[in-house]
């Protein structure tokens, strides 16, 4: 009887630990995704250039495409 009680207690602890771990994961994903800005926010704050603006590298453009020294449309 004592062995069964101990086994049930261990199982309960393991299940509650697993539930806590799974509960924290979605919060971490939300924090990661919320740190990223949308393309319009980046453009509005001047972090990237819009369409048909002079550029020197892909990262200069909000679309990520610098072709022929000008930003491409998305």
UniProtKB/Swiss-Prot annotation:
- Give a GO molecular function annotation for the protein: ion channel inhibitor activity
Q: Know anything about its domains from the record?
A: The presence of a 'disulfide through disulfide knot' structurally defines this protein as a knottin. The cysteine framework is VI/VII (C-C-CC-C-C).
Instruction: Give an example GO cellular component term for this record.
Output: extracellular region
Propeptide regions on this chain? 20-46
Its main subcellular localisation, reduced to a broad class, is secreted
Q: The organism's lineage?
A: Eukaryota, Metazoa, Spiralia, Lophotrochozoa, Mollusca
Signal peptide residues are 1-19
Name the cystine pairs: 48-62, 55-66, 61-71
> Domain of life, per the record?
Eukaryota
Keyword terms, alphabetized: Disulfide bond, Knottin, Neurotoxin, Secreted, Signal, Toxin
Q: Which family does it belong to?
A: Belongs to the conotoxin O2 superfamily.
Name of the protein: Conotoxin VnMEKL-0222
Cellular localization per UniProt: Secreted
Expression (tissue specificity): Expressed by the venom duct.
């Amino acid at each position: 009887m004592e062995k069964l009680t101990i086994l049930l207690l261990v199982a309960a602890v393991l299940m509650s630990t697993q539930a806590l771990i799974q509960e924290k994961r979605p919060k971490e994903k939300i924090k990661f995704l919320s740190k990223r800005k949308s393309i319009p926010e980046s453009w509005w704050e001047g972090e990237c250039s819009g369409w048909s603006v002079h550029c020197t590298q892909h990262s200069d453009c909000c679309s990520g495409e610098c072709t022929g020294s000008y930003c491409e449309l998305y």
